[in-house]
């Protein structure tokens, strides 16, 4: 059986400050750095050996991937970065404190923006300091595909081609795969892998630690699902 290990990035500085992060390129906190190292230690203890790793183009996921691979003595494993594994784009909520946003817009509205499958938050202004339209890491993309806001539905739509073109073929080739990504990009892929309904995915949370493991048969049917160390 092949294994797919999802590791959400360790706690970021904005997680710690309770801010909406999205595509803002925020670093790991001290706690988050240790979580990434501990994830690698759990991987080593479990004896999981990877053939390929994938991550986003955001430093908190990249660092988590590198730290986890290093701690599991697998830093040599090839790592491919893709914007398609980025966190959900929180639009105009990016950088806002979650509690303050609830006071400004109301608890119910913020809850809908955060937890509904297909309701978009307000768009981010194109001149916002965190706008991806002026970020050179996305310079090769057509401007029309760069989001100003995303819900989970849109996040899945842009992550799914990467699953179909990269991750699934690697698994079908018998490769064990590590994916260092983000809470919502992982949730989106979990929805697809498990065939969850729009309502069912709303109750799924992906913690910063520990990593989530899926084991598949040769047809990519899920054989088992578990968190390392639990």
Swiss-Prot record:
Protein name per the record: 2,3-bisphosphoglycerate-dependent phosphoglycerate mutase
SUPFAM superfamilies tied to this protein? Phosphoglycerate mutase-like (SSF53254)
* Organism this protein belongs to: Streptococcus pneumoniae serotype 4 (strain ATCC BAA-334 / TIGR4)
Against HAMAP family, the record matches this protein to: PGAM_GpmA
Function according to Swiss-Prot or TrEMBL: Catalyzes the interconversion of 2-phosphoglycerate and 3-phosphoglycerate.
Q: Gene for this protein?
A: gpmA
- Record-linked Pfam families: His_Phos_1
Q: Where is the active site?
A: 9 (tele-phosphohistidine intermediate), 87 (proton donor/acceptor)
The entry's family comment says:
Belongs to the phosphoglycerate mutase family. BPG-dependent PGAM subfamily.
Which GO terms are recorded in the biological process aspect for this UniProt protein?
A: gluconeogenesis; glycolytic process
Identify which top EC class this enzyme belongs to: isomerase
Record-annotated site: Transition state stabilizer: 182
Q: State one molecular function term (GO).
A: phosphoglycerate mutase activity
